[in-house]
């Protein structure tokens, strides 16, 4: 199972299953995790990227440990709605991951997630050095929270 639409994910998730959020960058992968009720997203660790096989190994170990039912991955669409090279790289990453796992992926528009994460960290008076360490997982948390809010809205209409 490679990718699902958010509506398909809402129908396939069982109560008590957690969802992970990913902010895929060229140097890092920010991770976030939902609670079992899928109401809140919490930033987790940041994976320093090396090569795909190692990145996949670390990500799948995280998924096994946290019992991840699905991944919500930020899709870096341009502000004008067009797709650039980062969108292509994200889709290629998901295609490659689909060969290694049955855990489904959901693409989520990540426009302004890093801006929102940076603003939140600034408001919490996090130092510049700490912001650099935490920005990717904070962005993953914003991406995941957007998807969780949508899932919650879909659940109320089912």
Swiss-Prot record:
An example Pfam family from this entry, by short name, is RuvX
**Briefly, what is this protein's role?**
Could be a nuclease involved in processing of the 5'-end of pre-16S rRNA.
Grouped into one coarse class, the protein's main location is cytoplasm
SUPFAM superfamilies referenced in this protein's UniProt entry, alphabetically: Ribonuclease H-like
The record's subcellular locations are: Cytoplasm
Q: Which SMART domains match?
A: YqgFc
In short, the EC number is 3.1.-.-
- State the PANTHER family in the record: POLYNUCLEOTIDYL TRANSFERASE, RIBONUCLEASE H-LIKE SUPERFAMILY PROTEIN (PTHR33317:SF4)
Q: What is this protein called?
A: Putative pre-16S rRNA nuclease
Could you list this entry's UniProt keywords, alphabetically sorted.
Cytoplasm, Hydrolase, Nuclease, Ribosome biogenesis
Source species, domain of life: Bacteria
From the UniProt record, give one GO term of the biological process aspect. Answer: rRNA 5'-end processing
Which source organism?
Allorhizobium ampelinum (strain ATCC BAA-846 / DSM 112012 / S4) (Agrobacterium vitis (strain S4))
Keyword Nuclease part of the UniProt annotation: yes
List the NCBIfam families.
Answer: RNAse_H_YqgF
The transmembrane segments are: none
Entry keyword Nuclease: yes
Q: Name one GO cellular component term.
A: cytosol
Which cysteine residues pair off into disulfide bonds? none
Query: Which CDD domains does its entry note?
Result: YqgF
